């Protein structure tokens, strides 16, 4: 491009700089204008690339003119930026004042999770019956979780596919507790009879389906004293069932097996949904009964393991799945829904 032609284009840009920057109404528009002039593809940079095409004796003067225009662009940008910010501040100051006394946006108040509400209700029932509440660690030793409770070495619960063992422990001595029975063991080791406790807490098992969760809440109970009998166990759990599920609740005990109790039983209550009158009931599968808990008389071997003479003392024990109890009370099909943090679901319970 010839020197005169390049000079004419420089003058055209120079004449419009002040007008264009004065017309910019906001910072976005200002930045776009600046980029159109001095950006990588801006018009002034494009003219700078044309300098080598001018005559040698014209290049110095043309370069000085280009640099002068660039300086004007920078100054115009600074002035326009200050003007736009000043105008924005003036608009903000002239706006109606904010009334800080107006109420904010309403938020629904928080409340306990359905699982914890159920647990609190169960604990309150047993505390009202004279039980103390005991707690223990969630990371437990196999000695307390299995050995002292009379689990045989080949019991399925001790397998890797049923229990979460801690990494880096080749001896499988440290684990996430599979029940709160270790709390009972620790309590019997540290306190001589009589013992009358409930042990609520989170437990872990390798199980995940519609009726099981790998992490769930359990509460176990223990009574050790002289002359504790199966009749005491039956009467205690019948009182619990009526207070938890209603005075009209019927109960039945079925023989079962647990390594740490003998005899052992499962307690069922009459269906809370169909009351045994609907063969198609999804809650009880048409049986009219719902499994609530496992229970039994403390095995003499367990008492010996913790230093209690089974000839002098007897004990009763029971374990309640709080998640399953909540599942029954709220008629929820999939127990995993309690842990999916769907606020709409949790708020409906």
UniProtKB/Swiss-Prot annotation:
Any one GO biological process: phenylalanyl-tRNA aminoacylation
Cofactors, names only: Mg(2+)
A Pfam match: tRNA-synt_2d
Keyword set includes Heme: no
Domain of life where this protein originates: Bacteria
Catalytic reaction annotation: tRNA(Phe) + L-phenylalanine + ATP = L-phenylalanyl-tRNA(Phe) + AMP + diphosphate + H(+)
Subcellular location: Cytoplasm
Co-factor remark: Binds 2 magnesium ions per tetramer.
A single cellular component GO annotation: cytoplasm
Sorted UniProt keywords: Aminoacyl-tRNA synthetase, ATP-binding, Cytoplasm, Ligase, Magnesium, Metal-binding, Nucleotide-binding, Protein biosynthesis
UniProt keyword Cytoplasm present: yes
Quaternary structure note: Tetramer of two alpha and two beta subunits.
Designated name of the protein: Phenylalanine--tRNA ligase alpha subunit
